[in-house]
């Protein structure tokens, strides 16, 4: 809520101008209602604001931006909120030292503005569901959910996939690598980012 209020204040917009409120999260407070609906009430957004959560893990913000852009094209209002929020301490396994050092709690929000004269935002999205890991098939691990990650596989996936996605999005935007002043990456791991930088 605080991140959303700060973003709206920085953008100089009031709640009545918001037509879309999206919350990318894997740690929502409730199964239902969605965190986005809770925010709609707390922020006093109009009742016809499109509100829902997105479960896309690390790629949630990118999915949120892409979805907000598409929804705003059909909205009577020109602003949307993308509010990323995670409370990963709820699901982190602190005995897994290779994983627990990567995660914490936090929230960030962005105001998205729709304009008919803006060029569409080139986006590359996708999924690779083959990498899910069932740790102990069919076993109920108890009341506390635990986040599990295969670090080496994640590293390989990131350093192979990110440069390819960069090439695709640059191609869709009609740009070359040299045309871009800054790239903003998901900050999961410094080694991954250094490897990508050298590769590009």
Set out the residue ranges of the language-model regions:
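Conserved active-site "lid/cap" helical segment
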Residues: 1-19, 139-181, 188-200
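Generic recognition of short, well-ordered alpha-helical segments
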Residues: 2, 34-37, 94, 195
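Short beta-strand segments
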Residues: 24, 55, 79-86, 112, ...
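Conserved catalytic cysteine-centered active-site region
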Residues: 26-79, 198-200
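Flexible, glycine-rich active-site loops centered on histidine and acidic residues
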Residues: 71-106
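Acyl-CoA/ACP chain-elongation machinery
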Residues: 84, 129-133, 190
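Condensing-enzyme catalytic core mediating Claisen C-C bond formation in acyl metabolism
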Residues: 94-160, 164-167
């Amino acid at each position: 809520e605080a991140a959303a209020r700060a973003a709206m204040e920085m953008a100089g917009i009031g709640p009545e101008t918001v037509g879309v409120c999206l919350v990318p999260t894997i740690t929502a407070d409730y199964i239902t209602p969605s965190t986005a609906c809770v925010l709609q009430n707390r922020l006093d957004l109009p009742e016809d604001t499109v509100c829902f959560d997105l479960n896309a893990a690390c790629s949630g913000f990118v999915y949120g931006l892409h979805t907000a852009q598409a929804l705003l094209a059909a909205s009577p209002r020109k602003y949307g909120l993308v509010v990323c929020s995670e409370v990963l301490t709820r699901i982190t396994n602190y005995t897994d030292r290779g994983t627990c050092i990567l995660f914490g709690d936090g929230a960030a929000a962005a105001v998205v503005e729709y304009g008919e004269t803006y060029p569409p935002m080139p986006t590359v999205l996708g999924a690779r569901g083959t990498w899910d890991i069932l740790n102990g098939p069919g076993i109920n691990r108890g009341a506390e959910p635990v986040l599990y990650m295969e670090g080496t596989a994640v590293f390989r996936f990131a350093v192979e996939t990110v440069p390819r996605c960069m090439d695709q999005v640059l191609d869709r935007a009609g740009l070359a690598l040299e045309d871009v002043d800054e790239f903003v990456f998901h900050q999961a791991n410094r080694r991954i980012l250094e490897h990508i930088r050298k590769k590009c």
